[in-house]
């Protein structure tokens, strides 16, 4: 019997906050370049804008409205969202995550990914992290592409149909949505809480 180990992406294989911070830096750079009447240099404006965005985020405010107000801009939220959603991050897996994936592959495990989110964002993260070294593209289920979100059974049943008679394990971080379906289907589950 072979083993299939599927992972969640955000806050399991990578920290979602790292994506958010790197995307915010890109947005801050974009906004700073559009601030024609600002007295600070673009680099200083980028740094201040990034700090302002993080403040707004942590206070639960609309980050993009706060950024526009801070810089005196009227950039459409859609423009900011386009940058956020299409941003190509440049970060790497933590060494211990790479070591784990290497060990699982060496042990003959088939690795998969089950992740909620927008296709472009999740694929950009997948590619930036180099996950294709361990996970075959056919073993990636992203909710927007697949047509259902966790905790739908369908996302997990996909792997059960693809690999009949395998032993399945799911590794995730969200007790509210990551474990209902795999537990119901008899999978082993591992919860990583931060």
Regions found by a protein language model. Give the residues of each.
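Acidic, Mg2+-coordinating phosphoryl-transfer loop and its flanking beta/alpha structural elements
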Residues: 169-194
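Short, acidic loop-to-helix structural element flanking the phosphoryl-transfer center
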Residues: 85-112
């Amino acid at each position: 019997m072979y083993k299939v180990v599927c992972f969640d992406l955000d806050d399991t294989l990578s920290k979602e906050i790292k994506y958010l911070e790197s995307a915010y830096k890109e947005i801050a750079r974009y906004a700073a370049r559009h601030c024609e009447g600002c007295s600070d240099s673009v680099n200083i404006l980028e740094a201040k804008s990034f700090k302002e965005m993080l403040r707004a985020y942590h206070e639960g405010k609309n980050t993009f409205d706060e950024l526009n107000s801070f810089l005196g801009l009227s950039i459409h939220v859609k423009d900011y969202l386009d940058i956020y959603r299409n941003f190509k991050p440049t970060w790497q897996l933590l060494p211990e995550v790479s070591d784990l994936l290497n060990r699982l592959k060496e042990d003959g495990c088939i690795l998969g990914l089950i992740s909620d989110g927008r296709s472009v964002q999740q694929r950009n993260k997948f590619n930036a992290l180099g996950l294709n070294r361990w996970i075959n593209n056919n073993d990636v289920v992203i909710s927007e592409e697949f047509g259902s979100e966790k905790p739908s059974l369908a996302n997990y049943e996909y792997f059960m149909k693809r690999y009949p008679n395998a032993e399945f394990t799911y590794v995730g971080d969200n007790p509210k949505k990551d474990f209902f379906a795999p537990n119901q289907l008899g999978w082993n589950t591992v919860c990583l809480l931060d």
